Amino acid sequence: MKPILPDYNSAGVLIIGDVMLDRYWYGPTGRISPEAPVPVVKVENNEERPGGAANVAMNIASLGGHAHIVGLTGMDEPAKVLTETLNSLKVKCDFVALPEYPTITKLRVMSRGQQLIRLDFEDKFENTDAEPVLSRMETALPSVKAVIMSDYAKGSLEHVQAYIQKARAANIPVFIDPKGADFERYRGATLLTPNMKEFEDVVGKVKSDQELVEKALALVEEFEFEALLVTRSENGMTLIRRGQEPFHLPTQAKEVYDVTGAGDTVISVLAASVAAGKSFEEACALANAAAGVVVGKLGTSTLSEIELAEAIHGSQDTDYGVISEQALIEAVKKARAKGEKVVMTNGCFDILHAGHVSYLNHAAELGDRLIVAVNTDESVKRLKGPGRPVNPTDRRMAVLAGLGAVDWVVPFSEDTPQRLISEVLPSLLVKGGDYKPEEIAGGKEVIAAGGEVRVLNFEDGCSTSEIINAIKGGKG
């Protein structure tokens, strides 16, 4: 199955669970300590990332969804860092601050790509009051279409049954990343995402696919779940539902560097996709593709909507289609080595019309390869105002990539593509409209590198704004 990306901007997701701050210290090791037989790390860099349930929220936001997170923290510096970081990513934070506890923090010391030690700063939350979380749920539920509960057994989900009942009473599906062998506490949830070890901790050793399906169905019946999605590492993932055939997906991972946070990514993409209107099968296929991307990254990682689109459409073949900036730069190098002339243009291309197609055909005729750089949704909104774009980035890029004239489609988030153009440095930069070559973003850089800048005419009578106005006016 090769699913189509949904509009994640329509996906509101509430995340409840164990929030953490992941800290990383990086540096070389060149000697052994004289005090003990351990390496000495000269710390040269550090990094802070939201982890646990906070990483789930960050994944939702990275996809373009609307994340609202509720969790327990201390009243300390890590809680402040978490809140500021998540707010900067447009995640709505609604933490319950408990002064007698520290915010869960994990410090990893890294050298040469290897983790040398992890230090955990935490106390399990116990005998907490459910009401502060329930009241926050009451406020959040009307604006979400899915609830994720991220359980790391740190105590934030001590009252998980009350939270499940609250969400289900509002007809909101509940997706749970479980911890531990007690699935009774998750009774009535919509879907659980245990990994193979977690699954076998509950049902015992599984020796075949058939046995996995039978034991999973027994759990679904016993605990009144709608489904289980068992993630099976190199064996992919299997969706088991009552009254339906099992749905299996092979792994899409090319290389595995770090599985930290992979479960967070699976449940994030799964729930956000369902919230955006996808079926369980389609949502699982998207989650499987996402997992294949993040295990190739180091540390707790998110992925963007663009990376997910590339994973689905096979971005390893960089001859054509939607492509990342780094992959584009490499593809352009290969094209130049073959003596191909690279042409580049840019625009919003919100509603593709005949004028756009004519313009792009003309641009393609001027060289061997045509790159189209596309403004992301936030960039379009800043340039065009409220109500734009009509079509989200992934859909605009998919339509452009389907045109025979276009070789590569790449997004950019700035107001102009000047930085991107200066990285790519095409042989020919073209722009449609009433411009002078020196006024075109990136033109100076292209000319300085020995390239050319040209202005092409748009076909008269074609305008995205006119099309939108006609639709609003009920014409045509």
Curated annotation (Swiss-Prot):
Coding gene?
A: hldE
Annotated catalysed reactions: D-glycero-beta-D-manno-heptose 7-phosphate + ATP = D-glycero-beta-D-manno-heptose 1,7-bisphosphate + ADP + H(+); D-glycero-beta-D-manno-heptose 1-phosphate + ATP + H(+) = ADP-D-glycero-beta-D-manno-heptose + diphosphate
UniProt keyword terms in alphabetical order: ATP-binding, Carbohydrate metabolism, Kinase, Multifunctional enzyme, Nucleotide-binding, Nucleotidyltransferase, Transferase
Q: What does this protein do?
A: Catalyzes the ADP transfer from ATP to D-glycero-beta-D-manno-heptose 1-phosphate, yielding ADP-D-glycero-beta-D-manno-heptose.
Highest taxon in the source lineage: Bacteria
What GO molecular-function term can you cite, just one? heptose 7-phosphate kinase activity
Q: What is its EC number?
A: 2.7.1.167, 2.7.7.70
Stretches for region Ribokinase: 1-318
State the similarity comment.
In the N-terminal section; belongs to the carbohydrate kinase PfkB family. In the C-terminal section; belongs to the cytidylyltransferase family.
Catalytic residues?
A: 264
Q: What is the enzyme's main class?
A: transferase
**CDD domains tied to this protein:** RfaE_like
Task: Return the annotated region ranges for Cytidylyltransferase.
Answer: 344-476
Can you say what this protein is called?
Bifunctional protein HldE
